[in-house]
């Protein structure tokens, strides 16, 4: 348990973007600079799981910053119970990861591209590859711990320079979080100071303070 280990280091402090949602267009220079610093702190890491209250904003910021540096990046939404990224990014909500894991869609059908523009584009040479969660799945743990999910995350890790997973929350029902933590190189917990859970059932690489 995290409570029995030394508290993980703070890897970055990311200011909250304008507005209430982690929209790509709301990421300003300060947010992108902070996320570049996070990418530097995670240098050598090929796959990152973001959890905590600010997980979506930090996952999107990290994926954007790494793409803007010219890296090939995939952003995978794994909060199957409460999907949120598709409307924020202007992407199709289905089919997504849940349909793929149930065998209702194949990989080419769920992969979407997000072209960076404006300050976020940086030195990007390719679009940000995105896979959204798909239709809500009330019991996601079994799907995320399935051979099909393990195969998918492994394939994404090999195909891209960085895989960023916008993961499930840290609240009750930690099965989905445990399943995904075993499939990545690093797990980061993201949130405002005082809101980050002190005890988690997974090894935590570091904290990202948000706001």
Residue ranges of model-derived segments:
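Conserved catalytic-core segment of NTP-binding enzymes
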Residues: 119, 142-211
């Amino acid at each position: 348990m995290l409570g029995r280990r030394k508290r993980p280091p703070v890897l970055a402090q990311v200011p909250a973007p304008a507005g209430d949602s982690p929209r790509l267009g709301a990421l300003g220079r300060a947010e992108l600079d902070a996320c570049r610093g996070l990418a530097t702190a995670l240098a050598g890491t090929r796959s990152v799981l973001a959890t905590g209250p600010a997980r979506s904003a930090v996952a999107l910021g990290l994926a954007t910053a790494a793409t803007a540096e010219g890296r090939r990046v995939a952003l995978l939404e794994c909060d199957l119970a409460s999907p949120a990224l598709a409307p924020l990014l202007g992407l199709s909500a289905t089919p997504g990861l849940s349909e793929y894991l149930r065998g209702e869609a194949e990989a080419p059908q769920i992969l979407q591209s997000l072209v960076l523009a404006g300050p976020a584009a940086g030195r990007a040479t390719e679009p940000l590859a995105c896979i959204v969660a798909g239709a809500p799945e009330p019991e996601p743990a079994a799907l995320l711990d399935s051979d099909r999910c393990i195969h998918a995350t492994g394939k994404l890790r090999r195909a891209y320079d960085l895989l960023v997973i916008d993961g499930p929350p840290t609240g009750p029902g930690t099965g989905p979080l445990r399943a995904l933590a075993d499939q990545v190189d690093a797990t980061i917990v993201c949130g405002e100071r005082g809101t980050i859970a002190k005890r988690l059932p997974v090894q935590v690489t570091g904290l990202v303070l948000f706001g």
